[in-house]
């Protein structure tokens, strides 16, 4: 009776999600093996007069063992095929980017600038694992690519080194490093050492490293932001100056957030290193598109919506709060707080929200107690069912309001 009960519970849970579960090929293979092993076990059990419930979990255990072995064999083959295809591309230059936060933004911004001069390709969406990169190289990397921009993420030490050894990037970018994913690495030192694995690339010629990373001075390493000066930052964009080759250069981009000036400093330095002129870079930044769900400004129904739902770090969320504070009208925020962080960070965030927002909608129950204790009670509304978010916003907001979606989380959080 265990498996019918488990399956029913799974289907009920999946139906309640605002984003239903997608079954990948790997999951389908796993389920196929599980069903096969289960039927074999049932047949053996029914044919035996002395059957017991002692082996009730045997199908799961056997399926896991068989599936793990199969997937490892498949992956070794896929990886070898991807390496051959990757090495067959003549004169390819690869830029690999890692950071605790901001790596996807840097990748997207760099792609927008470089594509104006070179045949450029980037890993899609937030793909940043060795498995995702191998799949991308095998299926989608064009053979006429001149510059390949890849994002490198990690859950354990060694993940980024594996990516570095596979891609062997000539240019390595290490962005801001902080306590994001501290639950995986336990200490900030472990996070820093893991990010620095990118510099082990056998073919690295140049590295651009954020000043938050404690690294010695090397001829091949440039630390950034170098004499960055933010002139102005508001809901219309950012204006900033950067020192390049001993000269102060002026830049403007129609995206939001002081931290994006830091991300763009890395983009400017890499683009200039790869042969683009300052004028070409300045022109490209003028048309820089907003990154979806990362301080994306949308105007609809007489309201200003700031979609920052993919931003889950303290610095980024504080910056979103700071930008919204420049708005003179009524301000509303929808957030679950910080999901992968400390109580201290959530308390700091809650206090800043309390100072700058008129109404706070808390989604989920993860940080409800912390936020309710640090935000004026009359401002707080706890939304337990996210499917009611649209009707709640229609009821609690009006024309002229600014609405910030900050680190929105799925129901199961």
Stretch-by-stretch model annotation:
Residues 104-108, 232-248:
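Acidic-glycine-rich active-site phosphate/pyrophosphate-binding loop
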Residues 211, 217-235, 253-258, 282-287, ...:
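Beta-strand->loop->alpha-helix junctions that form or flank phosphate-binding loops
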Residues 209-215, 226, 364-368, 410:
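Short, polar loop motifs at secondary-structure junctions
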Residues 158, 182-183, 217, 230, ...:
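Glycine/Thr-rich phosphate-binding loops of Rossmann-like dinucleotide-binding domains
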Residues 1-72, 203, 272-279, 283-305, ...:
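ATP-dependent carboxylate-amine ligase
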Residues 1-211, 215-217, 268, 272-274:
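Phosphate-binding loop of NTP-binding sites
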Residues 166-179, 214-217, 251-290, 318, ...:
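A conserved, hydrophobic alpha-helical segment in the catalytic core
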Residues 235, 255-266, 292-294, 313, ...:
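Short glycine/threonine-rich catalytic loop with a Thr-x-Gly-x-Asp
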């Amino acid at each position: 009776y265990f498996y019918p009960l488990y399956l029913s519970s799974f289907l009920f849970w999946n139906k309640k999600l605002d984003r239903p579960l997608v079954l990948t090929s790997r999951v389908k293979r796993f389920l196929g093996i599980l069903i096969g092993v289960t039927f074999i076990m049932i047949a053996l059990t029914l044919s035996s007069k002395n059957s017991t419930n002692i082996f009730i979990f045997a199908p799961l255990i056997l399926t896991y063992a068989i599936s793990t072995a199969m997937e490892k064999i498949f992956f070794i083959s896929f990886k070898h095929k991807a390496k051959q295809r990757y090495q067959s591309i003549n004169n390819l230059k690869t830029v690999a980017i890692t950071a605790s936060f901001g790596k996807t933004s840097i990748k997207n911004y760099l792609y927008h600038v470089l594509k104006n001069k070179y045949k450029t390709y980037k890993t899609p969406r937030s793909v940043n694992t060795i498995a995702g990169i191998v799949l991308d190289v095998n299926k989608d990397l064009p053979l006429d690519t001149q510059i390949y921009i890849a994002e490198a993420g990690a859950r354990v030490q060694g993940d980024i080194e594996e990516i570095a050894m596979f891609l062997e990037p000539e240019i390595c970018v290490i962005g801001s490093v902080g306590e994001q994913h501290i639950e995986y690495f336990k200490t900030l030192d472990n996070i820093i050492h893991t990010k620095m694995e990118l510099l082990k690339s056998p073919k690295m010629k140049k590295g651009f490293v954020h000043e938050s990373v404690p690294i010695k001075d090397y001829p091949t390493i440039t630390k950034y932001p170098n004499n960055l000066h933010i002139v102005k930052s508001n809901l219309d964009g950012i204006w900033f100056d950067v020192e390049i080759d001993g000269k102060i250069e002026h830049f403007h981009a129609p995206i939001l957030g002081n931290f994006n000036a830091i991300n763009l400093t890395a983009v400017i330095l890499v683009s200039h290193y790869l042969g683009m002129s300052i004028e070409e870079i300045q022109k490209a930044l003028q048309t820089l598109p907003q990154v979806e769900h990362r301080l994306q400004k949308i105007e609809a129904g007489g309201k200003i919506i700031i979609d920052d739902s993919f931003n889950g770090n303290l610095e980024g969320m504080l910056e979103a709060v700071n930008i919204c504070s420049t708005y003179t009208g009524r301000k509303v925020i929808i957030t679950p707080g910080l999901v992968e962080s400390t109580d201290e960070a959530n308390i700091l965030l809650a206090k800043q929200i309390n100072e700058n927002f008129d109404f706070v909608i808390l989604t989920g129950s993860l940080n409800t107690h912390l936020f309710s204790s640090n935000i004026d009670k009359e401002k707080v509304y706890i939304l337990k069912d996210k499917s009611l978010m649209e009707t709640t916003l229609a009821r609690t907001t009006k024309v002229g309001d600014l609405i910030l979606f900050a680190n929105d989380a799925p129901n199961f959080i």
